[in-house]
Structure formats: C-alpha cells, structure tokens
C-alpha cells in the first residue's frame, strides 16, 4: 500500500484536499488523455468543461481512474479502509482564447 507522508496528511486535515499526488505513469496519463479527448469530441467542449458529472457510469476510463489501486491506497491511508465512490466530476480549465 502506498502511504501518504506526514506533511500530506497534515495538509489534508487542515485544508480538506490534496493536489500534486503522483499516481499515474506517463503512459497511463497519455491513454486517459486520449480517451478524454475522444469524449470531448463526442460531447463538446462546453459539456466537458463542467458537465462531466458521474461519467464513470458510462465511461470505463473514468471508472478505471476513480478505482485505481494506487489512488485507493492513498485514500485509505488518509480516510480508513472503508471507501465508496459517491461520484466523479471533471473540472476542465481550458486556456482563455
């Protein structure tokens, strides 16, 4: 099981979130990005910017990301063994044109 560092745990307790957690390999990130780009091509940029809520029900790659063993290990280290995926949501920050 991957463990969080004490500084990360402290940040999570104080701020309620963490960022910059290194979970996925470059190849995994590339694969997820390709799948997201295909989803964006189907649904449109506006929908993908804020409207991808609970897409893990329809999109296997979102489910795979949300249930990644490395992610679950990290979350269990922070929150305990019993976890449940309540929802997924993409927040896409596109460049201003």
Features from the language model and the residues they span:
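Non-heme Fe(II)-dependent double-stranded beta-helix
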Residues: 1-15, 19-97
